[in-house]
């Protein structure tokens, strides 16, 4: 991968930054707080932003630029495997895409989403490889020395060993599946051992069943023939018996019907006599109707007029009352409208004045909002200082650096003492060995060597060795504690180094805050809020007045409409009174008296008309009953004739039916049906059994074939199993060999770089693979020593050497290295060495991007980009 261009918008101190990178060593240089590391973080976020980064505690709010217009956006152009890519992320809209150029045209390389883009980049360059071998972050140079397991994970990903391990495990599963198949087939062969016997037994049973089927099939036809004859005889006798029963029922029904007709005739004759008497009575009442008709006509006319008159009168009086009240209310509202019109004009003038003043105050309110944002940022940054002031942070950092120097000097002094003690111990042990071998003269003092003198010297040297070992143990423990303290101190140093950057940001923001006149701005804001509240209140009142004035205007038309309705109602009322007078009445009371006089005649007329209607109805019913009586007599004669015919037929049928013969035939029919049913059921049972036996035979023969196939397949599976086991062994051996060769190469590169850093003090870096661990050792004076032997500065140098070795190993596959401030924890001599290493080693990597505030590194760079902070914004300047 080679990064060609990075565009950053509203990311931390970067408002709009465009940086182009070239092949070779690219150096981004600038003072602390100028946005150098932020640019590298933008590359990390741009490439890998996903749940993984969010779970590590990185949030959008932490890198979104305060006061920035528009959202945070990152665009990265890079090249990989001779293909050009453009990656874009917009964090405010949660939009992302990755495009690749093919044949001069751009197409989407993945789904356009945050997670899909990150997944695609992960396939090109895994996140853990990028973070541990490609991108060496500020203060994290020696972090890879902390855990053997983490280091092993990085090495596995760099070497693609995970794929081999996956293949190894997949083959293990295949081996298990093959074994299961072999066991399954062996089990099947064991289960089907007596297959030939089962086939023979089923074939014998089939022959037996087929013989019985033939026997039953020959018996059935004659029995079925006799059954059909008997069934016909029984059917004929049952038909006669049924007809006899049916005729008996019909005769009984006809007799019942005859009785009913006789009773009906008696009832009709009685009803006819009663109706004749009632008709005579009603004819006497009806004869007075002509006399009453004139009075009834007058009554109806007057009563109809009165009802209509009273209804219209009530309606008109009610409407007049309602319209006159509404007219009065409208006139009052119209009078009030003039006052509201004047108030509306007064409010409009006041709103214009307030609006003008609000526009004047708006810039002050916006400026105060910016100031508040700066205050919030200062508070958030101060919270990260854990209660310390910026000055206290600088003071604490200086104190920690001083303490680190003291501990390193103490470790150096102790290391020298340990070396001296080990030398003294070795000298004493060498003297004891020489004394054991010596004869004649003493190798120590030159005197004659007696056994007593020899014993005395050896005891003295042994005692001295014991004292040296005790002192060595105490001193080694003291050194271990100092190194533990040094590691803790370096963690604090990294923490306070970050806090120092935060403190500088706070100073910059506080300086910016001083540029705001907060007291004046807050006063303007209070005035703005008060005027805004008054403006909204007046605006609401004006809207209410305007609605009222619109309603008043509409009421003018309503008033004219109501006045017209009142006029028409009064005309209609006068017309109603005129109609009353035309009938000859001066008042409604006179009309009611006449209606009361006519009511007696009306009641008599109504009663007579009811009787007239009843008379007509009775005469109609009388005629109907006479007709009904004639019909009943005719029906009675028909029923008597039908009874006589049915009884004759019944007598004839009874002479043809013999009950004893019928019962004998029925018993024979049941017996034959049972016999046929039994034989048929047995035949069906035998046929089903034959089909089952045939199916069983087919299955058994298939199993026999499968059994033979299973024997052949077992042989094939056993051969395949042998091949799988052989392949697993080869993968395991290759993985071990590949890892060993790679670690040897990484060890060679790291040894060369680390030896240069330490002026040859440490001759080698040993990288050794163990189960799920990759361990590191250094060689000092020909002996392997653990990393606890190193001073703090030497650990930084080793961390840098190992990371550079990983990057150098990746040359040709991933030609990219990113270094963020590699020099802060290196002394002057090691910084000088780093320049030499850059010239001799980093030149092999196609592209190196390095961030530093150290001007010395410019000499080793091919392309220098300078960042500076102006007005809280990062600015880019290409130096060379």
From Swiss-Prot:
Sites where the protein binds ATP: 12, 32-38, 138, 789-794
Domain named Zinc-hook: residues: 397-494
Cystine pairs: none
Coiled-coil region: 225-336, 391-744
Cofactor names: Zn(2+)
GO biological process terms, semicolon-separated: double-strand break repair
Keywords assigned: ATP-binding, Coiled coil, DNA damage, DNA repair, Hydrolase, Metal-binding, Nucleotide-binding, Zinc
An example Gene Ontology molecular-function term: zinc ion binding
Family: Belongs to the SMC family. RAD50 subfamily.
PANTHER family associated with the record: ABC TRANSPORTER ABCH.3 (PTHR32114:SF2)
Chain's role: Part of the Rad50/Mre11 complex, which is involved in the early steps of DNA double-strand break (DSB) repair. The complex may facilitate opening of the processed DNA ends to aid in the recruitment of HerA and NurA. Rad50 controls the balance between DNA end bridging and DNA resection via ATP-dependent structural rearrangements of the Rad50/Mre11 complex.
Complex and partners: Homodimer. Forms a heterotetramer composed of two Mre11 subunits and two Rad50 subunits.
Name recorded for this polypeptide: DNA double-strand break repair Rad50 ATPase
């Amino acid at each position: 991968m080679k990064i060609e261009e990075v565009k950053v918008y509203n990311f931390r101190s970067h408002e709009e930054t465009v940086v182009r990178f070239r092949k070779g060593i690219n150096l981004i240089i600038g003072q602390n707080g100028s946005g150098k590391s932020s640019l590298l973080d933008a590359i990390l976020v741009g490439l890998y932003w996903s749940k993984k980064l969010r779970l590590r505690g990185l949030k959008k709010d932490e890198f979104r630029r305060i006061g920035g217009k528009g959202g945070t956006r990152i665009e990265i152009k890079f090249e990989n495997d001779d293909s050009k890519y453009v990656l874009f992320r917009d964090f405010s809209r949660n939009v992302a895409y990755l495009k690749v150029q093919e044949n001069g045209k751009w197409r989407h390389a993945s789904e356009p989403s945050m997670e899909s883009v990150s997944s695609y980049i992960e396939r090109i360059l895994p996140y853990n490889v990028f973070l541990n071998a490609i991108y060496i972050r500020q203060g994290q140079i020696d972090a890879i020395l902390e855990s053997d397991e983490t280091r092993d994970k990085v090495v596995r990903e760099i070497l693609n060993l995970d794929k081999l391990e996956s293949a190894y495990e997949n083959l293990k599963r295949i081996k298990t599946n093959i074994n299961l198949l072999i066991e399954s087939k062996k089990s099947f062969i064991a289960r089907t051992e007596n297959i030939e016997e089962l086939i023979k037994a089923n074939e014998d049973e089939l022959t037996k069943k087929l013989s019985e089927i033939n026997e039953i099939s020959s018996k059935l036809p004659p029995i079925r023939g006799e059954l059909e004859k008997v069934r016909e005889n029984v059917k004929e006798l049952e038909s006669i018996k049924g007809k006899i029963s049916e005729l008996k029922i019909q005769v009984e029904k006809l007799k019942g019907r005859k009785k009913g007709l006789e009773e009906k005739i008696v009832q009709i004759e009685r009803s006819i006599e009663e109706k004749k008497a009632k008709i005579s009575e009603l004819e006497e009442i009806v004869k007075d109707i002509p006399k009453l008709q004139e009075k009834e006509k007058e009554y109806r006319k007057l009563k109809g007029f009165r009802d209509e008159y009273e209804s219209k009168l009530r309606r008109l009086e009610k409407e007049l009352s309602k319209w006159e009240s509404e007219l009065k209310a409208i006139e009052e509202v119209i009078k009030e409208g003039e006052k509201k019109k004047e108030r509306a004009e007064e409010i409009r003038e006041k709103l214009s004045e307030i609006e003008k003043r609000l526009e004047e105050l708006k810039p002050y309110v916006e400026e105060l909002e910016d100031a508040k944002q700066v205050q919030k940022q200062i508070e958030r940054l101060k919270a990260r200082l854990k209660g310390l002031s910026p000055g206290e942070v600088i003071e604490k950092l200086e104190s920690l650096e001083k303490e680190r120097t003291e501990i390193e000097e103490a470790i150096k002094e102790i290391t020298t003492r340990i070396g001296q003690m080990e030398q003294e111990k070795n000298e004493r042990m060498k003297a004891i060995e020489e004394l054991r071998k010596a004869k004649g003269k003493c190798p120590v003092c030159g005197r004659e060597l007696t056994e007593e003198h020899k014993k005395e010297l050896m005891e003295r040297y042994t005692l001295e060795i014991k004292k040296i070992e005790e002192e060595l143990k105490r001193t080694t423990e003291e050194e271990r504690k100092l190194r533990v303290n040094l590691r803790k101190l370096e963690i604090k140093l990294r923490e306070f180094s970050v806090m120092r950057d935060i403190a500088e940001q706070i100073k910059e923001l506080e300086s910016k805050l001083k540029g705001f006149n907060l007291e004046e701005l807050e006063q303007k804001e209070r005035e703005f809020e008060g005027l805004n509240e008054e403006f909204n209140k007046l605006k609401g009142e004006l809207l209410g007045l305007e609605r009222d004035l619109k309603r008043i205007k509409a009421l003018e038309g309503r008033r004219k409409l109501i006045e017209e309705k009142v006029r028409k109602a009064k005309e209609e009322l006068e017309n109603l009174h005129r109609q009353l007078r035309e009938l000859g009445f001066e008042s409604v009371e006179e009309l009611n008296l006449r209606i009361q006089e006519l009511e007696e005649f009306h009641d008599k007329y109504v009663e007579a008309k009811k009787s007239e209607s009843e008379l007509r109805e009775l005469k109609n019913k009388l005629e109907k009953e006479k007709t009904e009586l004639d019909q009943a007599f005719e029906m009675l004669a028909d029923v008597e004739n039908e009874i006589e015919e049915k009884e004759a037929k019944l007598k004839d049928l009874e002479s043809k039916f013999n009950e004893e013969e019928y019962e004998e035939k029925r018993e024979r029919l049941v017996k034959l049906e049972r016999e046929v049913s039994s034989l048929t059921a047995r035949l069906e049972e035998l046929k089903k059994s034959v089909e089952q036996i045939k199916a069983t035979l087919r299955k058994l023969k298939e199993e026999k074939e499968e059994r033979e196939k299973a024997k052949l397949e077992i042989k094939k599976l056993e051969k395949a199993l042998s091949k799988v086991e052989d392949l697993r062994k080869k993968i395991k051996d290759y993985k071990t060999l590949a890892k060993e060769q790679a670690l040897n190469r990484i060890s060679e590169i790291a040894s060369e770089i680390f030896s240069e850093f330490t002026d040859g003090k440490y001759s080698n870096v040993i990288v050794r693979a163990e189960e799920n661990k990759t361990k590191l050792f250094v060689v000092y004076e020909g002996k392997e020593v653990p990393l606890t032997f190193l001073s703090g500065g030497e650990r930084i140098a080793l961390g840098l050497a190992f990371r550079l070795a990983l990057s150098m190993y990746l040359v040709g596959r991933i030609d990219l290295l990113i270094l963020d401030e590699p020099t802060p924890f290196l002394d002057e001599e090691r910084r000088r060495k780093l320049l030499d290493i850059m010239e001799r080693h980093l030149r092999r990597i196609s592209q190196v991007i390095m961030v530093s505030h150290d001007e010395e590194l410019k000499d080793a760079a091919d392309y220098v980009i300078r960042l500076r902070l102006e007005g809280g914004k990062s600015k880019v300047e290409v130096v060379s």
